[in-house]
From Swiss-Prot:
Protein's UniProt name: UPF0182 protein Lxx09300
Family as reported in the entry's similarity comment: Belongs to the UPF0182 family.
Chain intervals with Gly residues compositional bias: 897-932
Signal peptide: none
Location relative to the cell: Cell membrane
Bias-annotated ranges (Low complexity): 705-719, 933-947
Region of interest (Disordered), ranges: 700-719, 886-947
UniProt keyword annotation of Ubl conjugation present: no
Broad class of where this protein is predominantly found: membrane
GO CC annotations on file: extracellular region; plasma membrane
Keywords linked to the UniProt accession: Cell membrane, Membrane, Transmembrane, Transmembrane helix
Amino acid sequence: MTSAAAVRSPGRRRAAVWTTLGVIVALVILFFIFAGLYADILWYQQFGFLSVLTTQWFAAIAMFFVGFLGMALPLWVVIQLAYRLRPVYAKLNSQLDRYQQVIEPLRRLAMYGIPIVFGIFAGVSAASRWQTAAMWINGTPYGKTDPLFHLDIGFYLFALPFYRSAVGFASAVVLISLLATLATCYLYGSIRLSGREVRIARAARVQISVIAAVYLLLQGVSVWLDRYATVTDANVNNMINGAAYTDVSATIPGQAVLAVAAVFVALLFAVTAFTGRWRFPVVGTALLIVAALVIGAIYPWAIQRFQVEPSQKTLETPYIQDSIEATRDAYGLSDIDVVPYNATTSAEAGALRQDAQTTAQIRIMDPAVISPSFQQLQQFRQYYSFPRNLNVDRYTLNGSQQDAVVSVRELNQSGLTSRSWYNDTVVYTHGYGMVAAYGNQRSSDGQPVFMEYGIPTQGTFGAYEPRVYFGQQSPTYSIVGAQKSAKSIELDYPGGDNDAQQTYTTFSGDGGPKLDNIFNRLVYALKFQDEQIVLSTAVNKDSQILYDRDPIKRVKKAAPYLTMDSQAYPAVIDGRIKWVVDGYTTSNQFPYSHVGSLSDAIADTETPKSAYAFDDINYIRNSVKATVDAYDGSVTLYAWDAKDPVLKTWQKIFPSTIKPISAMSAQLLQHVRYPSDLFKVQRSVLGQYHVTDAGSFYSRDDAWTTPNDPTSSPTDPTLQPPYYLTMQMPGQKAPTFSLYTTFIPQAASDSSRSILKGYLAVDADAGSTKGKVAPGYGKLRLLSLPSSDTIPGPGQVQNNFNSDPTVSQELNLLRQGKTDVTNGNLLTLPVGGGLLYVQPVYVKSTGETSYPILQKVLVAFGDKIAFEDTLDQALDSLFGGDSGATAGDNNVPATPGGSGGGSSGDAGSSAGGGSSGGGGSSAGGSSSGSGSSGTQSNAALQRALQQAKQALSDREAALKAGDWAAYGAADSRLQQALQAAIAAEGR
């Protein structure tokens, strides 16, 4: 007995050990899960949007239980009924006996386990669709009806998706219940197979018949709902979206017939529960399947093939017209002003006199090119950086509005020479200051002219909080804050030689969860997998942890229902640097509206195309404007489109999270702009839907597209992005800050694609009155060029620039040396009664610390071009010696007064002979240039160019002959000639 106990004791001990280990592992896993959830609560609580998190959690939990119970309970009931109503003395074959012997010990586990497992899967699926249920419960009427069923569009946006989802879920529950019933009845003898004979017990017959009847009823409801879904489906060879002739004449009536037939067959199954005769429901089911094939597929195909296709244009016209009107409504294009524009191509003297204000604001600083200039002139230390693409905004200076290229000096820890947890987390925590350059000016050596610059900040913006704790390049997390008596350890900004006079600061805002107890520190140590959060003495009771610092991500967390614009831009507003972010409400359920991929629509040179995006939409509104404070990360949401029914619905779900427009300050409105992503979507749709006549739309003989960016790679072309400019469109009383794009024909022929067909601009200025949006904001104006006009498009203009003998000679010579030539954005402006093209040309040396300088400006009007050192000179050259207007670079300032900044490293390396930091020698600015008839250059420049040409020829000849000594001598002469040419230009 003792021996047996000894044998059992190790087994019990091992079981106890394994049980203990299992419990410990489970507790650790649960604690990790809890830590993540608790960290979210702390973050949202400090963020001020805890209700957003809890609403999502409660809604998902509620939907989980609905899904769990909706699946598990019916499944458990049918299994229990099938088992309890089994025939007690049924004669089973040997095979079923073996099955029962295997299953019986696990019967109780299976009867509860199977419903629970299926219930969990169903609950998870239902929880993921909480938004669909919430939108159905809180749906808002749209105020318009669809043209076919005459139901409010809100039914399609909010109710129909939920109804179809609910019916689909119920159908899955009933189908799984039917399969479970059949399996249980078979295992326990309620269904017996004897040769060709199938015997079904009465109780099983009733249960199976009722479940089958319910399933067919649900299929009838599903088919009935499918009728309404036809108005949101693609049709007519994807030409339009929504029900077309075949749908209205065949598919929808056929679906109604099938729905009624399904109900009839369901009644036959219900009758069978009492009569026991399976012949009628089985025959009815077979006929239903045949009817589905004939009525649901063959008949619509025949109508389409033999009736519609021979007369498609005539029969589809009313439905195409419905699609045109719905699409323009859904994408905000209903109120667009279309103006015929008979553009002249004659560049006459004084042609720009009536457009003097627009001409003065033409931007020559390309935000996609001059980031290295900001980097070298305003970086100051390697641990600061600027984004690759800068932003365009406007500021009111001395009573007038001025376009500016702006950015913030963000922290870039990859530039630190000494990396450690202490430095990365508690010392280098934030960027510093705004940097802004005039969009229409340049210094004498081609550098940007800064209106706000330096560390500490100086310029025209006045006093504001310059520290950037929340930005697009901020570290993953930083720990900030300390007691008032403690010494500051956060580096604020450098100063003096070798950083001998560095300034330190302590974060004093409320920007992140507090680390005032060991539990919070442990939670975040687990979240970021970093034990130093617990161990470091730099963390104190006043410390805060800042994370999730990207402005777009923060707005997305505050409003998870929004689709975010791809760009956030900084502005100095009410004494703070704030990021302005645009949010959209979207849907793909708008009746008859064109469906397109959002990612495809916004892809261009500035926004790369997403390879795996699933973001088809057919409705979009810029419903929310948001700001993110760069110092403390606080987010404020404003209902920009308060009439949007989708936004109204979400406001019911998340009440008190969005402020009205009346709460927006005057300074904030001054920096609000029309969002570029929305404009890109609208232009992609307008390429086809500018045609409002259904017949013309069907023939697609006037379809447009956005031209490729002339500055993109020929091997991988991308669309030209829209550009922000202050300009006066034909019909406007004064210039406004606008966003524009151009259109060319959508055709396979290269010759036809080069012609400009349309010019779309939107008023992007929201005004400067507190709580009131300017009446013109968002007004779309389309200049439609006559088909007989042959105005060159951006691609053809770029070809003209490149093929001009004088222009190409000078630029090609520059490219042969140790310099790179970069063409800036090719701008198009409707001025002078025609279309003016402006393109800045930048030159930079090939050194690592070089940066682009503005060397020349190319302009074109009609077939004439000019190539000068400044825009003002180029316009005068283009328009017969006097354009009638003055550009912003007519009085080029001296560099010390214009650049206003230093640099890190050899910032002054340039192709123009070198400029150093905030000052330097001139790199252009002479009056030499070329019109369409050639360049009027000084003798020194011509001589230097001839010498360079000869040296290049000699070098090529030496290369072919294999004479390396002669090759080296010729190359040396080429470099000397190029430097002489640049020096001659600078005089």
